[in-house]
From Swiss-Prot:
Summary of subunit composition and partner proteins: Monomer.
Keywords tagged on the record: ATP-binding, Cytoplasm, DNA-binding, Isomerase, Magnesium, Metal-binding, Nucleotide-binding, Repeat, Topoisomerase, Zinc, Zinc-finger
Entry protein name: Reverse gyrase
Source organism: Pyrococcus abyssi (strain GE5 / Orsay)
One Pfam family linked to the record: DEAD
Catalytic activity: ATP + H2O = ADP + phosphate + H(+)
Length: 1214
């Protein structure tokens, strides 16, 4: 037993040990001996029976009942289909049994339609009514057949009614009569039927379950959202109230951007909460039905869809995946494009898509198709006018399809045939082509061109272009494609539009005119022609710009790699390079979007092995589609819950895998995505949820006896935080009331635990992805403990950067909790509490001030600041500053008087190599951010935390300077492209350890990052401030410099003789080779060349008195902590912050120097005079070492606690 958690027993809600929780059992008060069983379900049943027998059964009954009902539903499913549930289907059933509405995000072959049909039968057996809404008549027929087959197999009979256009007249009449009379348990129709027959036949009906298969068709009539809500039991009045909340939240978002609107924000929040309470009351008092929406491929647009969020607690996501499992390759052609394509098809076999770039157009696509036909290939051309080829391809009558590579092209977007499409060939790089006068411009192409050429414009024009670009992007964000086409047509035909659309047209027009104007500038054209990433071509006397069309490449190549039940099919893409510059641009943009993107020469891949993998995946997909999948493959798709600390991190991770669906669980938001082999729900825990209590044991730690020796067990309870005054505490003095200000507006982390337990019930496994250090490990341990009884499997995942490859790798390498790290953190917290409480109480007694407090690590640090201040005040002296005729400035200490001339006594000039510094560790970053940016340590850590959580930098709490291979690759790419490959000098900088140095996660500098965020290529869950960019720039430059060749300078060191003594001057005369100084200034000043014996006139004299010793900044103090082995990367900033918060130290305004206050000096003197050995620098350093030993399993943590306890008794309690 390591700890006790109050209020966490899953049965009685009382106190329970970590051991019992890990054994998935209730507390000892409920069951004297723990129950063991071979699997989770059996354990739940056995514990329930034991509790019942003992007469202590309480909340465990809910857990038992849920598992029992799932078993019953699964038995029926087995009878109806012959299969057991997939993990994902089991999750869906658990949600339904608990009355939750949700959006299903799941890949091809996950049995969504089968599940919808089955669950309606289950509801019918239970006397409940269901409605299945599908997009088309063939799907109505298919769904009805599924239901009938299942009823027959399961031997049940329920009343089924369906309606579609192919029914005979008499059948239609009978169906309509039965619908009108409510003579059915299950109704199946198209979404069109819901839209047209609602008022006449459905308005008065009430359903327990509505299953919407394919939300895209359903949403074509946005009124269907209101209709579905009415059918589930809401009134129009409640729907209108929810609509009010949506509008109020929009207003609130705007107010939060403005300054000084706190009062309005508070009032709006109150109004929103009031309406939300009304809605919640209505839901409680009325038995509202369940809505299940099978995921969209497009994104659900418009505000009306948000009604589902307000009334049913979920948001529809998009099933569109951004995962790629594609081998990207290229060929530099040695013969005609047609011959290269023919040659490739002979090597690759059947099942290919061939994309012709837009500059070659439909004519070339026709020529290529005819050429391939003449060579004996079964191939068809597909275009908007001729889609016949699609059916022939699907039926296997043709082996290849040819189409033009445009974003909305028929075979670029419309094909989802994971079992048939094996590879894609690009007969030229996908590109946009623009004539200089921009004939027939489209909105997306204009945005693409603007984004590419803004960097070539003069400053003033660039700023104008950036504003126009941002406006146009913002305006079109929620406009569907068909409406954009109307705007484009209006511009071409020179006609006006109505209202908002006319406003968009106006801005579009301005953007086109802006481009036409800047493209007449010869300097701009010259710069474009020299750029290696876009192409300038003359065709028939006309100039054209060609830029890569990366969106089309992603979409088109993506046809070869689809998400299916069990993973992502492997695909192959081959680009025949017809323009090297546009190809370079395409690669660069792919790397911006996909951290893991790499492209190889086609002849360098192992083609046989790639094709074998491609074909194995196609076999699996066919089996899934035909329903012949084996049990073993079925369990490839697990439902999993990933828990991280912060909402930013949760949102960033979710965004890697498409547009997530969202569910509100209590006060938390869960994001759901599919990653092929996992249906992943991502949730933010909100960081630390537990802390030591103050009302039990010795300051929250029980002291028990084990073999006559004391044994220490911390007691934890949830952390409470007052939303009004910010006070944080653990023990209630009065339940629900803040002990500091009396407010009832208090958040208890218990609510977060309940939300996590609710989600834990649904899934097969939990992955805990808290920060990769001892603190993160302790949070993970707490989460593991309190969730253990609710789920069969819990693992810890660790990642040092928030990027898609790092997350997927962490999931693959999931491990158990590192108990030694946890023990080290337990000791750190207990030691902190004991010393803190004991010393604070002494300070209260002596100074009669209950606001004072003390800690072991802060005390020596406070001492350094006190000592430095003393030296500062005692070191005042006279300074003389001389400026010489050649511009050199020198300062002389202890000097007063006039000087007219000085002489160069000695000079050494030599060539010197200056190496770059290693990339940042935490302490070095804090020092530089303090020195160059004027940031406090706390501010820097918060900004770095944001950059980490947003996936822009690696983990920022580290004392390692090591750079991984990934890091070296990033530097290589940036240096080669932006500076020159000859500057690259890879360095590992030290041994590989648990952590890496702080570095960027992509080869993108600050200017480019700002542009990519502006262009929407990088989308972040929160806005970055100017200070985020300043810190990113510091980290980026230091890292890139660390991977560049040394600089070489002509170094000079001179001794200058003055009447007051000699002064040394050093610097460089000139840079011989710039090396890393291309990205960061050198640490030396440039000085003029001097000669021995040279006499120099003094042109300016300044005299002043000042202290010789300067005061510390936050950066200086952190450098000392690192140097003297006190504190850790995770505590440096906190230690300084604590001293400032307690008022022991203040920071001067301008130069940000640290000055001890009178209170700080008195407290320090008292502590050192009474408890010197306890708070000495040496003892603190020793303890840091002991913590490391516990972490490395070299010290027994109980033994360490015994020593600490003895030490405190010896020094304080005696």
């Amino acid at each position: 037993m390591k700890a006790i958690y109050r209020g966490m027993c899953p049965n009685c809600g009382g106190a329970i040990t970590d051991e019992r929780l890990a054994e998935k059992n209730p507390c000892e008060g409920c069951l004297s001996e723990p129950i063991k069983a071979e699997d989770y379900e059996k354990l739940v049943f056995a514990v329930r029976n034991a509790l019942k027998l003992r007469g202590t059964l309480k909340d465990w009954e809910d857990l038992y009942r849920l598992n029992k009902e799932v078993s019953e539903v699964e038995d029926l499913f087995k009878r109806a289909t012959g299969f057991r549930f997939w993990s994902a289907q089991r999750t869906w059933v658990k949600r339904i049994l608990r009355g939750k509405s949700f959006s299903i995000i799941a890949p091809t072959g996950m049995g969504k339609s089968t599940f919808g049909a089955f669950i309606s039968i289950y509801f019918a057996i239970k006397g409940k009514r269901s409605y299945i809404v599908v997009p088309t008549t063939p799907l109505v027929v298919q769904t009805v057949k599924k239901i009938q087959d299942m009823m027959e197999r399961a031997g049940v009979n329920v009343r089924l009614v369906y309606y579609h256009g192919n029914l005979k007249k008499k059948e239609k009449e009978e169906a309509l009569k039965r619908i009108k009379d409510g003579d059915f348990d299950i109704l199946v129709t198209s979404s069109q039927f819901l839209a047209t027959r609602f008022d006449e036949l459905l308005r008065d009906k009430r359903f327990d379950l509505i299953f919407v298969d394919d939300v895209d068709a359903f949403l074509k009539a946005s009124k269907n959202i209101d209709r579905s809500l009415l059918l589930l039991g809401f009134t129009q009045e409640v729907i209108n109230r929810a609509w009010e909340v949506i509008k109020l939240k929009k207003q609130l978002a705007k107010l939060l951007q403005a300054q000084g609107k706190e009062k309005e924000v508070e009032e709006l929040n109150k109004e929103i909460e009031k309406i939300e309470r009304e809605i919640e009351r209505y839901r409680r008092e009325n038995n509202i039905g369940i809505l299940i929406v099978a995921s969209a491929t497009g994104s659900a647009r418009g505000d009306r869809i948000k009604l589902y969020r307000e009334l049913l607690g979920f948001e529809v996501g998009s099933g569109r995946s951004v995962l790629r499992n594609i081998v990207d390759t290229y060929i530099i052609p040695e013969r005609s494009i047609e011959e290269e394509v023919e040659n490739l098809l002979r090597k690759l076999g059947k099942g290919g898509l061939i994309f012709v770039p837009i500059d070659k157009g439909i004519e070339f696509a026709e020529e290529l198709t005819n050429y391939l036909k003449s060579k004996g290939f079964k191939v068809e051309l597909v275009s908007a006018k001729n889609k016949r080829g699609l059916e022939l391809f699907e039926r296997g009558e043709v082996d290849y399809l040819v189409g033009v590579a445009t974003y909305y092209g028929t075979i670029v977007r419309g094909l989802d045939l994971p079992h048939l499409i094996r590879f894609a060939v690009f007969a030229g790089v996908p590109k946009f082509r623009f004539s200089m006068d921009l004939e027939q411009p489209t909105i997306y192409r204009v945005l693409g061109l603007m984004s590419e050429i803004l960097e070539f414009l003069p400053q003033e024009k660039r700023e104008e272009g950036e504003k126009l670009y941002a406006r146009l992007r913002r305006l079109i964000r929620n406009i569907p494609q068909y409406e954009l086409m109307k705007i484009e047509e209006a511009l071409a035909e020179g006609i006006e539009l109505e209202g908002f659309h006319n406003h968009v047209l106006d801005v579009f027009k301005q953007a086109v005119e802006f481009l036409r104007e800047v493209l007449r500038d010869e300097e701009v054209i010259r710069r474009i022609s020299e750029n290696p990433f876009l192409s300038l071509k003359e065709v028939e006397g006309k100039l054209y710009i060609e830029i890569p069309d990366v969106r089309t490449y992603i979409q088109a190549s993506g046809r070869t790699s689809r998400l299916f039940a069990g993973g992502i099919t492997k695909g192959l893409s081959v680009i025949i390079v017809d323009d090297q510059k546009v190809f370079n641009g395409l690669i660069r943009q792919m790397r911006w979007r996909f951290v893991e993107f790499e492209i190889k020469k086609f002849e360098e891949i192992n083609l046989e092995s790639v094709l074998r993998e491609i074909d194995e995946d196609r076999k699996k997909v066919r089996l899934v589609i035909e329903g012949k999948i084996s049990e073993q493959v079925k369990d490839l798709v697990k439902s999993a819950l990933m828990i991280v600390e912060s909402p930013n991190k949760a949102r960033t991770i979710a965004s890697f895998f498409g547009q997530p669906s969202k569910r509100r669980i209590g006060e938390l938001v869960a994001y759901e995505v599919s990653i092929g082999d996992k249906m992943l729900t991502i949730l933010a825990s909100g960081g630390h949820m537990f802390d030591l209590v103050t009302t039990e044991g010795y300051h929250g730690v029980l002291i028990l006896k084990d073999d006559g020796k004391p044994y220490y067990v911390p007691v934890y309870d949830t952390i409470k935080r007052c939303r009004d005054c910010g006070h944080q505490f653990v023990d209630w003095e009065q339940k629900g009331v803040c002990p500091k200000c009396g407010s009832r507006n208090v958040h208890d982390a218990l609510e977060n635990v309940k939300a996590m337990r609710e989600l834990a019930l649904e899934v097969d496994e939990i992955l805990i992805g808290t920060d990769p250090d001892t603190e993160g490990e302790k949070i993970a341990w707490d989460i593991r403990n309190v969730l253990s009884p609710y789920t069969p499997n819990i693992k810890r995942i660790e990642f040092h950067e928030v990027t898609r490859p790092a997350i997927l790798k962490a999931i693959k390498e999931a491990r158990d909790i590192n108990e030694d790290r946890v023990k080290a953190q337990l000791v750190r917290r207990i030691e902190d509490r004991w010393i803190g409480f004991e010393l604070s109480q002494k300070l209260w007694e002596v100074f009669e001030n209950r606001n004072l407090s003390a800690g072991r690590v802060q005390t020596p640090v406070l001492g350094w600041i006190v000592q430095r201040y003393k030296e500062f005040t005692e070191s005042e002296t006279d300074f003389l500053g001389l400026t010489l005729e050649n511009g050199i400035s020198i300062t002389i200490e202890n000097a007063k008087g006039e000087v007219k001339e000085v002489e160069v006594k000695d000079v050494v000039i030599e060539e010197r190599e200056i190496n770059p510094l290693p990339p940042y560790t935490t302490d070095a970053m804090l020092q530089d951010a303090s020195r160059f940016l004027g940031f406090s340590a706390t501010k820097t850590m918060q900004l770095a935390q944001d950059l980490f959580e947003l996936g822009l930098c690696t983990y920022h709490r580290t004392d390692s300077i090591h750079v991984s291979n990934t890091g070296i690759e990033i530097a290589k790419e940036y240096i080669s492209e932006e500076i020159g490959e000859e500057y690259f000098a890879p360095r590992k900088w030290g041994e590989e350890g648990a952590h890496e140095a702080i570095r960027p996660t992509r080869p993108i500098d600050t200017g480019r990052l700002i542009q990519l965020i502006r262009d929407g290529i990088i989308t972040l869950p929160r806005n970055l401030t100017k200070d985020h960019f300043r810190l990113y720039d510091l980290i980026f430059r230091r890292f890139i410099a660390s991977q560049m060749k040394p600089a070489r300078v002509l170094y000079e060191k001179a001794i200058i003789s003055t009447p007051f003594g000699d002064v040394e001057v050093e610097g460089y005369i000139e840079i011989l080779y710039d090396g890393w100084s291309r990205v960061k200034p050198l640490p030396l000043k440039q000085i003029p060349k001097l000669e021995k014996g040279q006499k120099l006139k003094v042109t300016e004299i300044k005299q002043w008195r000042a202290p010789k010793v300067s005061l510390y900044t936050q950066g200086d103090v952190i450098a000392l902590m690192k140097e003297r082995g006190i504190g850790r990367p995770s505590t440096y900033a906190k230690i300084v912050q604590t001293l400032l918060q307690r008022g022991y130290v203040i920071e001067t305004k301008g130069r940000k120097k640290l000055v001890p206050t009178e209170k700080g000096i008195k407290v320090y003197q008292y502590l050192v005079s009474k408890y010197k050995d306890l708070v000495s620098e040496e003892r603190t350093r020793q303890l840091e070492k002991i913590m490391d030993e516990i972490e490395e399993a070299k010290a027994d943590y109980q033994e360490v606690l015994r020593e600490l306890h003895e030490e405190i008794k010896r020094y304080i309690r005696s």
